[in-house]
């Protein structure tokens, strides 16, 4: 099932009109769209109905190749809410990027100890995302050397999982407020990754996430913290420069640390937000977790967009 939603201007998540198009979503070139467009789709994948939004920006040209960002909502969130507060609509419009917002199973992703029914039922979310990428690539003009993953909280853990288990697909990853919750995959080859984390995050603590795993998983598996996660990725990417991350930029409200001399020309970065909590998206009307309004989404995009396969 496909619903075509026309995005009103300014591009802030408002939806002005819905069409009644209903076509087979497995056939390429399925619709002649008016841009910008927000397309709401569902199809059966592995016996389950899976849904997503696709933002096709004003600058989309089927004769050119466009980057793709897979943008994953957090636990108990959904694709529509995340479209409205993640600000990747701005990135899409300013850079002619296609952004897809998948919907997690029961509003969750299977990404390690966090979180919800997707984890409990062993949902193959990596498989779902890879099939979704194949579908989008068949229907739109995608630069397959510039596919990126992003997300928030449980969606950030899923972003890490995709970077770890599908490093042959993704050129880079960048997300907010969670870590890699699995061991390095045998198939992993280094790609670049940036994580953004608020020092005042009470849901996924900056220092270590034991309280989070105890709450969400009734376990003490949450040994990960923001700096340790950065160090772990540095080791996975065989980064040079010693065990302690280098501080590259430092301001009153945030800093950027990590490694910039790693295998395959990759980098691993951590953005520490001194006054932010769990949802540090800019100009956020849903949450007030980024009080100094650091443009975290732009930081993530500028980092990811440097890299291609």
Regions found by a protein language model. Give the residues of each.
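Hydrophobic core
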Residues: 5-13
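A domain-start/cap signature at the N-terminus of enzymes
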Residues: 14, 20-68, 80, 94, ...
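Serine-hydrolase catalytic machinery in alpha/beta-hydrolase-like enzymes
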Residues: 39, 43-53, 59, 63-148, ...
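Alpha/beta-hydrolase
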Residues: 70-72, 176, 273
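Short alpha-helix in the alpha/beta-hydrolase fold that links the catalytic acid
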Residues: 84-85, 206-214, 222-235, 245, ...
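Short beta-strand/loop motif that positions the catalytic acidic residue
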Residues: 195-197, 201
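Acidic catalytic loop of the alpha/beta-hydrolase fold
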Residues: 201-204, 278-280
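Catalytic active-site module of serine/aspartate enzymes centered on a nucleophile-bearing elbow/loop
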Residues: 288-309
């Amino acid at each position: 099932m496909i619903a075509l939603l026309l995005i009103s201007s300014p591009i802030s998540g408002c939806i002005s009109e819905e069409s009644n198009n209903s076509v087979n979503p497995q056939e390429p070139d399925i619709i002649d769209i008016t841009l910008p467009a927000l397309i709401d789709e569902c199809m059966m994948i592995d016996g389950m109905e899976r849904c997503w939004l696709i933002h096709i920006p004003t600058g989309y040209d089927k004769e050119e190749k466009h980057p793709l960002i897979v943008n994953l909502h957090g636990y108990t969130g959904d694709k529509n809410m995340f479209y409205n507060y993640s600000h990747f609509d701005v990135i899409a419009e300013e850079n002619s990027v296609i952004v897809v917002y998948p919907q997690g199973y029961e509003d969750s992703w299977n990404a390690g100890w966090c979180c919800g029914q997707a984890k409990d039922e062993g949902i193959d979310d990596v498989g779902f995302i890879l099939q979704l990428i194949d579908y989008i690539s068949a229907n739109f003009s995608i630069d397959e050397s510039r596919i990126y993953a992003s997300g928030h909280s449980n969606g950030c853990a899923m972003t890490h999982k995709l970077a770890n288990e599908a490093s042959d697909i993704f050129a880079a990853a960048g997300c907010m407020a969670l870590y890699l919750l699995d061991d390095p995959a045998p198939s992993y080859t280094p790609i670049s990754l940036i994580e953004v984390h608020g020092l005042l995050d009470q849901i996924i603590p900056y220092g270590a996430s034991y309280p989070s795993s105890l709450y969400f998983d009734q376990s003490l598996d949450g040994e990960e913290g923001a700096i340790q996660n950065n160090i772990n990725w540095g080791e996975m990417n065989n980064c040079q420069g010693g065990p302690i991350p280098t501080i590259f930029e430092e301001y009153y409200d945030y800093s950027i640390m990590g490694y910039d001399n790693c295998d395959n020309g990759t980098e691993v970065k951590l953005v520490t937000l001194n006054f932010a909590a769990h949802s540090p998206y800019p100009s956020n009307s849903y949450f007030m977790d980024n009080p100094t309004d650091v443009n975290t989404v732009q930081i993530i995009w500028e980092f990811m967009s440097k890299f291609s396969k």
